[in-house]
Amino acid sequence: MDLSLLWVLLPLVTMAWGQYGDYGYPYQQYHDYSDDGWVNLNRQGFSYQCPQGQVIVAVRSIFSKKEGSDRQWNYACMPTPQSLGEPTECWWEEINRAGMEWYQTCSNNGLVAGFQSRYFESVLDREWQFYCCRYSKRCPYSCWLTTEYPGHYGEEMDMISYNYDYYIRGATTTFSAVERDRQWKFIMCRMTEYDCEFANV
């Protein structure tokens, strides 16, 4: 093959390959703050936000009993479609306390675009906050809960939203006082392509 042709084709192949992640998604790969690819070390707090105009589409986590029964976390983001437009406002939701089960959706019809968490040694658990963004006056519909992630306490967690039409709006979690771990069910919703009158759904 002519060397000049190779130099012309190489950037095209690299660009086509690079736009898809491990799961065939054109989303930003899992964020890498450390050598091991996690946004936090065990027993440490963290704050993660998607870039402007992107939302969370994947959540990955591993559990360590010996490191305070804590988890390390990683996230992936994806740009929202043009039909949603740009986010009109973003905010941090109320804190979900450590050691308790909880259920929360983004208020004001928001979508999850980040997570913030702090670890408490006394409870061997974390408190959580969602970072939410609202897109004009779009409303959620056809919402459903995912299965539990992880499938059993202490297991690795790998949740990926394979459907472009559904967005994470929140989660419900259970907490095991014995295992000191959580199982998550994510609240997935579609969003209208037009403005609606409901202040919060």
From Swiss-Prot:
Entry keyword set: Cell adhesion, Disulfide bond, Extracellular matrix, Pyrrolidone carboxylic acid, Repeat, Secreted, Signal, Sulfation
Any one GO CC term of the record: collagen-containing extracellular matrix
Main localization category: secreted
Induction note: Induced by TGFB1, repressed by IL4/interleukin-4.
Subcellular location per the Swiss-Prot or TrEMBL entry: Secreted, Extracellular space, Extracellular matrix
Keyword hit for Translocase: no
Region of interest called 3 X 6 AA repeats of D-R-[EQ]-W-[NQK]-[FY], as start-end residue ranges on this chain: 70-186
Mod. after translation: Sulfated on tyrosine residue(s).
Entry keyword Secreted: yes
UniProt-recorded name of the protein: Dermatopontin
Gene name for this UniProt entry: DPT
